[in-house]
Structures are given as structure tokens and as C-alpha cells.
Amino acid sequence: MTSWTEFAQQAPELAAFGQARFQTGVAYLATVRADGGPRVHPVTPIIGQQLFLFMEPTSPKGKDLQRDGRYTLHCAVEDSGGGGGEFYVRGRATLTGDPALREQAVRAASYVPEEQYILFVLTVEFAFMNQYVAGGRNSRRWQAGE
């Protein structure tokens, strides 16, 4: 399991691109429902030493992640031409009650998380980016352990 910091050390350009894309606003979190089907949710990722997500304790996405921690997180794309590019990561999410991690996430957040929000730490197992340029695209990928 790879933290965001470890990912950034191994693939600094890819991590910097991903951080920039996630900071532009809403991203989309895919989880696995209890019946095995996919579920997609808008979220605001937080990047500090770890990749974090806060959410309401009653959120369906939180229930999904507590039952099956697999996730994929994809940045919003600005337009049908690909805008600033695409970035996504996949890995495992773990619910944490650690006060030090919560403090870290609150400090890194672009908003003030509500006290009742639960916190997930997301590992990075795979990352991929596409930048669309005149005449083609620039793609990169990274996988933990490669």
C-alpha cells in the first residue's frame, strides 16, 4: 500500500499533475455497492502527506468504502476536448479515527470539514494521466511495485 507521499517520491511529475487537477474542484469517486454494482460520487479530495476524503457518516460512499475499500478517483474534466487533462488513481480506502491524521487532513483541506465527518485515508496503487495537446496526447502511468 502506497501513501500519496511515497507515490510523489516515485513519480513526482505525475503526482504534481494529479494534485493540480484535483485542486481544481470536484472529483468523482467510484466505489462498489453491496450488490457489486458501481457507484459514482462527487467528492473533494485532500492531498497532504496522504490522500484523504472527508464525508458524512451516513454517506452511501462511506458505507461502500467501509465494506469494500476499493476505489477509483477521477478528476473533473473541463470540457469535451479534455481541458487541462485527465488524472485518476485507484487503490484502497481505510476509515481512520486517528486524531493526528485528522489534524493533518484538516490543515491540508481547502474547506473546513464538519466535526461529524468521518475520514478515509486512500492508498495509491495505480495512477494515470492524459494531457491533450495539438495532434495527440501525452499519457503517463504508474503502478506500485513496478
Task: Place the predicted regions along the sequence by residue.
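Short, solvent-exposed coil/turn segments
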Residues: F22, P38-V40, G82, E115
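Short beta-strand segments
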Residues: T24-P57, L65, Y71-V77
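Short, conserved active-site entrance elements at the starts or edges of catalytic domains
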Residues: T2-D35
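Charged, gly/pro-rich active-site loop segments
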Residues: M1-E13, G81-E146
